[in-house]
Amino acid sequence: MRNLLFVFILSMISTTPSLALGNYKNGTIAFERGDYKTALKEFTDLTEQKDSRGQYGMGLMYDLGTGVSMNFEEAVKWYQLSAEQGNADAQNNLATMY
């Protein structure tokens, strides 16, 4: 029974990053297609996991006003959170906004 529990926990840990990658990929594809509702959902799910790519995606949506009302304060907030985790795209966009 312990071995089964160990295998289950190990499988959950090993699939979590790939699930986050899937959310980001799905969000990016939706964004590029103009399906901003789906992109917003995918990026929101990622931000709840403190994922820098999701935070960057949210910043971009608020920066451009795609799928949400344009809001530079919100864009800066999301870019800042992402930039603090080392996301170079967020760092660049944040610098451009200042």
Predicted regions: what is each one?
Residues 1-4:
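Positively charged n-region of N-terminal signal peptides that target proteins for export
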Residues 7-15:
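Bacterial N-terminal signal peptides
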Residues 16-20:
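Sec/Tat signal peptide C-region and signal peptidase I cleavage site
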Residues 23-30, 57-64, 93-98:
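Hydrophobic face of amphipathic alpha-helices that form TPR/SEL1-like repeat modules
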Residues 31-35, 48-51, 64-66, 71, ...:
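Short helix-capping/linker turns of helical repeat alpha-solenoids
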